[in-house]
Amino acid sequence: MGRAKKVVLAYSGGVDTSVCIPYLMHEWGVEEVITLAADLGQGDELGPIQEKALRCGAVESLVIDGKEEFVKEYAFRSIQANALYENRYPLSTALARPLIAKMLVEAAEKYGADAVAHGCTGKGNDQVRFDISIMALNPNLKVLAPAREWKMSREETIAYGERYGVESPVKKSSPYSIDRNILGRSIEAGPLEDPMTEPTEEIYLMTKAIADTPDEPEYVDIGFEKGIPVSLNGVMLDPVTLVERLNEIAGNHGVGRLDMVENRVVGIKSREIYEAPALLVLIDAHRDLESLTQTADVTHYKNTVEEIYSQLIYRGLWYSPLKEALDAFIVKTQERVTGMVRVKFFKGNANVAGRKSDYSIYDAELATYGMEDQFDHKAAEGFIYIWGLPTKVWAQKMRG
């Protein structure tokens, strides 16, 4: 008896997920494999994917357009939370996994499958994100991960696939592992496994080298409503178009590159290169608008929440009770985060050049050092005495 009767497989069109199709059928006794490819803005990579899956033995090949849901329900929530894993990575790849898991579960329920599968290995983060998300959405579904068990080398995997008509798209001149969606690209492996090896310019597609960027700055006004980006330069845009246009603008000025060593869920460190132009700019602009519209205590407490929120996303806990509870807090904090942030793009930098909001709690008459100053300077002395009293008492005791 096979491990499952009917399986919905998360499909990318690459070697591993293509080999998963015959492997599931011939090694694990699966009767039917349905592939599902999520269109999250990979570009033309999804063109021939349906035909390839069918040639590899799938009984049906699904391609689902999830770009709008991805940006609106996943990326924009992350922006409201200023989510940066380890204060740097904007989770452009990690955010896609809970949505793909949701699509897998929905397809399994629609087609009567008793299992879902993915092509993740046992070394990466994505296996954790897929497995836990699927467990949360439908704990009755089996989760199969052939690449986690088959113990084949890259060469052996390709050879196995060729026995069953799987074509290998791998170019020997490209040793990198690359993942792409509308939010950005992640590049790893090959020469990048040496933390001292500088990335070559050829690995970047979304961002220009500084030498190739314009010699004049460009200003962009980003409009927000309740923490959600809604416009560029006063023009209201749908979520997908807004991200696409900002990717182009920021990338044209060399903005959006990251080179970091991060702590994976499975306990190892990994060197990663990321391109995420729009996402990084939006998080920075959003945080700046919050500084204008939120009280100090909300800002300081939210900083703690943001760190935990980022960890939950990275570690595959998008559908967890804690994540749901933090969502409620974050939404509440965004009620007055409405306004505009002006960003200046120039030579690899995206700096906030101005901000405004009808909900601003910045008071120029209190902040100024000019003649218009309304701040009560005399009140400062009493405040300092009370505020510093514990320190003074402690110092007196320590001195005996």
From Swiss-Prot:
One Pfam family, short name: Arginosuc_synth
Positions contributing to L-citrulline binding: 89, 125, 129, 177, 186, 262, 274
Catalytic reaction annotation: L-citrulline + L-aspartate + ATP = 2-(N(omega)-L-arginino)succinate + AMP + diphosphate + H(+)
Regulation of this protein's activity per its record: Activity decreases to 53.9% and 18.4% in the presence of 1 mM and 5 mM arginine, respectively. Activity also decreases to 80.1%, 78.1% and 92.1% in the presence of 5 mM ornithine, lysine and succinate, respectively. Activity does not decrease in the presence of glutamate, glutamine or asparagine.
EC number(s) given by UniProt: 6.3.4.5
EC top class, as a word: ligase
Alphabetical GO biological process terms: argininosuccinate metabolic process; L-arginine biosynthetic process; urea cycle
Binding of ATP, residues: 10-18, 38, 119
CDD domains cross-referenced by the UniProt entry: ASS
Coiled coil: none
Major location category of this protein: cytoplasm
Thermal dependence, as annotated: Optimum temperature is 35-40 degrees Celsius. Inactivated above 50 degrees Celsius.
Record keywords, A-Z: Amino-acid biosynthesis, Arginine biosynthesis, ATP-binding, Cytoplasm, Ligase, Nucleotide-binding
Pathways involved: Amino-acid biosynthesis; L-arginine biosynthesis; L-arginine from L-ornithine and carbamoyl phosphate: step 2/3
Subcellular location: Cytoplasm
GO MF annotation: an example: argininosuccinate synthase activity
Gene Ontology cellular component terms for the protein in this record: cytoplasm
UniProt: L-aspartate binding residues: 121, 125-126
Recorded superkingdom: Bacteria
Family listed: Belongs to the argininosuccinate synthase family. Type 1 subfamily.
Primary role: Catalyzes the condensation of citrulline and aspartate into argininosuccinate, the immediate precursor of arginine. SyArgG is the rate-limiting step in arginine biosynthesis in Synechocystis PCC 6803.
Note in the entry: A mutant overexpressing this enzyme grows faster than the wild-type strain under photoautotrophic conditions with 5 mM NaNO(3) as a nitrogen source. In contrast, the growth of the mutant is similar under photoautotrophic conditions with 5 mM arginine as a nitrogen source.
Quaternary structure, from the entry: Homotetramer.
Protein name (record): Argininosuccinate synthase
Origin organism lineage: Bacteria, Bacillati, Cyanobacteriota, Cyanophyceae, Synechococcales
